[in-house]
Amino acid sequence: MCHHTRSPEAPTENDRRAFLRGVAAATTVGLGATAGCLGDDPEPAQTEPPAPVSLGGGKACDACGMVIADHGGPSGQVFYAGDHPSDRDGPAWYDSLAELVIERDAAVDRDREPVGTYVTDYAAVDYEIRETGGDRIISSHVAPDTFVRWDEAVYAVETGVVGAMGPDLLPFSDRGAAESFVEAEGGRLVEADAVTADLVSSL
């Protein structure tokens, strides 16, 4: 897949950090406003998560509004029990995993139950890294079979390879592939259960 280049208006590192801080602040402020609207009866738990969907076809990130397939880097999707997102069936979707983590954590704080999270699996695709405007941007992959369950991946961080919103988590379902990536690109590996909003905001 060819890599999409960034336009002159693409987010800078300061823009990215400001955006992520804004997302975190906005979702935190919303907790009190939504808490009283939730029903007392929990949604029944699902034993198997829904299958991932394509993030192509002009789908725009639920956090920043950018068209997911038009930008490089990992993308992700989160299915929730109940009617979230409220404007459509299916998952919430994001063009970066930093946004996904912050939004998912905030949804959990509002008593939303994630029943399936999927992220780009760079061990399952023939990815490219392209230098554009001084950045080394990894390719985007949006077909359903390019996603892996969140907890089945290990994440490369602090690598110097970026995605749609700058530095991001780079998921691999195969640890050997992840270790080879870090050996070539720098950084370190983080397990899924160690990924927090504080971590992604610090990247």
Segments the model singles out, each with a brief description of its role:
Residues G73-Y80:
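Short cysteine/histidine-rich zinc-coordinating motifs and their immediately flanking basic loops
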Residues G65:
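Cys/His-coordinated zinc-binding microdomains
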Residues A69:
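Short functional micro-motifs and their immediate structural scaffolds
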Residues R6-A33:
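N-terminal secretory signal peptides and thylakoid transit peptides that target proteins
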Residues G90-G133:
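Mid-length scaffold segments of soluble, non-membrane domains
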Residues E13-N14, A35-D62:
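C-terminal segment of N-terminal export signals and the immediately downstream linker at the start
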Residues P144-E191:
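A short, solvent-exposed beta-edge/loop patch
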Residues C2-P8, E13, G36, D40-E43, ...:
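Extended, aromatic/histidine-rich regions of cofactor-dependent oxidoreductases associated
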